[in-house]
Amino acid sequence: MSWQTYVDTNLVGTGAVTQAAILGLDGNTWATSAGFAVTPAQGTTLAGAFNNADAIRAGGFDLAGVHYVTLRADDRSIYGKKGAAGVITVKTSKAILVGVYNEKIQPGTAANVVEKLADYLIGQGF
């Protein structure tokens, strides 16, 4: 399966996230949903935050033109919030999954979908 298929089918296609991307550990975009553009600088900042989250814990982070307040940040997952919407990011051994949800979607539902896809990819060696 292609990275784009994972974005279109396993993330956005579930209805649990409205926008999604898969990034490399260097922050470069491998696949993205339409209209969701993570800049290289944003990807690099996000990728680095999995190793040292101090900066994003203090000041939040930006993705695709939206500033998020950091709710959770560890070496596997970074969760952000903007009003009633938010973002779930999960790191695997080779990629970073990004799933954005809107105010109509429960955060736990979005987190479940992104985390489960990450678990699957980790199990496949990714």
Swiss-Prot record:
Annotated region Actin binding: the residues are: 2-36
Which keywords label this protein?
A: Actin-binding, Cytoplasm, Cytoskeleton, Methylation
Sequence positions bearing N6,N6,N6-trimethyllysine: 104
* Superkingdom assignment: Eukaryota
Cross-referenced SMART domains, in alphabetical order? PROF
Gene Ontology MF annotations: actin monomer binding
Subcellular location(s): the record lists: Cytoplasm, Cytoskeleton
Q: Output the Gene3D superfamilies linked to this UniProt entry.
A: Dynein light chain 2a, cytoplasmic
Task: Cite the InterPro entries for this sequence.
Answer: PFN, PFN_euk, PFN_sf, Profilin_CS
Question: What cellular-component terms does GO give this entry?
Answer: cell cortex; cytoskeleton
Principal subcellular localization: cytoplasm
Q: Where is this site: Actin binding?
A: 116
Describe its function: Binds to actin and affects the structure of the cytoskeleton. At high concentrations, profilin prevents the polymerization of actin, whereas it enhances it at low concentrations. By binding to PIP2, it inhibits the formation of IP3 and DG.
Complexes and interactors: Occurs in many kinds of cells as a complex with monomeric actin in a 1:1 ratio.
* Assigned protein family: Belongs to the profilin family.
Question: Could you identify this protein by its name?
Answer: Profilin-1B
Q: What organism is this sequence from? A: Acanthamoeba castellanii
Its taxonomic placement starts with: Eukaryota, Amoebozoa, Discosea, Longamoebia, Centramoebida
